[in-house]
Amino acid sequence: LYVISKMMDIYDVDGFRFDLMGILDVETMNAIKEKGKKKKADFMLYGEGWDLPTMLDYKKKASIMNQNVMPEIAHFNDYFRDVVKGKTSDDQKYSKGYITGDTEHAFSFLSAITGNVMGDPLFKRFEQPDQTINNIETHDNSTSWDKMHACCNNEDRQTRKERQKMMILTTLISQGIPFLHAGCEFCGTKNDDSNSYNAPDKINQMDWERAVFYSDIIEYTKKCIALRKEYKQFRLHTTEEIMEHVKVNVSDGGIVFYDIFMEDEQHHIDAIRCIFNPSYNGREYDFEPNWKCIFDEYGQAHEEYGTHVEVPALSIRIFARIA
């Protein structure tokens, strides 16, 4: 606690991220949070809440299973990562997630994009959305691009690029705290090294040539970030708000509908609808009047209104209903 306090005083630190947070105890983490919040109201505390083999009693571990007694402390959400991208262990590198093409995960995907805070029939993992760090990759395990090199090895580069874009947008429009690993915006690779902590710079360095080659995804990522900032609907602060305003369901073929019904006077809309289509086939739907596309697979908005909408293959389209 002394070190935490001094670092905030001397270096004006805004928050801390704890590696292997699960080896610590609930009491210590809560004390750190209280100390930090007294100094800065927006102090942020998060870490790896894995259930690690220590002598601590299970109920005292600062693990994700005890999130209910650690309010305002966030955890890397491996459920989100595995459902969206697919499991990351070497023995399951060929398994797919929802966005990488396995629509059997569609129902689990509903839990992931709603912050894992909605109960039965969905999987509730957290008490509040500020406890989940939504990510598709971190410094550990394979990058999402390397993961697709295994699980989507039958697909061409352009198809995998579209899936990469879908994973980035999913991270940024889901309820909870988005986490983008540096390099995912230009399809970063570690040359299939899934445990590169002791690998040389050749593996772990940022390959800036890829930033040129995949500049279109960088631009798309910028638009995704701007979208989240622009629309408060993707940044609901409490479980109560999510329960009140968000509706999710799975349509035919594993297509996911993510609706947020909320009055928005700034944009003169009363609902947002996100449609996820990770399949090879485009979809068409008939809506009630006054819907328009505000974000397509290029990050562009469409001017026209209509009742008939299209969602191309391998894309997420976002629509708004004019109030």
What label would you give each PLM region?
Residues D9, G22-M29, Q128, R160, ...:
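Active-site-proximal structural scaffolding
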Residues Q158-K161, L172-L180, C184-F186, K190-A323:
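Carbohydrate-interacting/catalytic domains
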Residues V13-L24, M148-T159, W208-A211:
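The substrate-binding groove and active-site-proximal loops of carbohydrate-active enzymes
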Residues N30-K33, K59-A62, N195-Y197, E288-N290:
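Short, glycine/charged-enriched secondary-structure capping and boundary segments
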Residues K33-K38, D42-C187, N191, V246, ...:
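Conserved alpha/beta catalytic core and glycan-binding cleft of carbohydrate-active enzymes
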Residues I4-M8, K33, I133-I136, I168-L172, ...:
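Non-transmembrane alpha-helical segments in soluble domains
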Residues D12, Q128, N204-Q205:
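Flexible glycine/proline-enriched surface loops and loop-helix/loop-strand junctions
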Residues L1-L56:
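Active-site neighborhood of glycoside hydrolase catalytic domains
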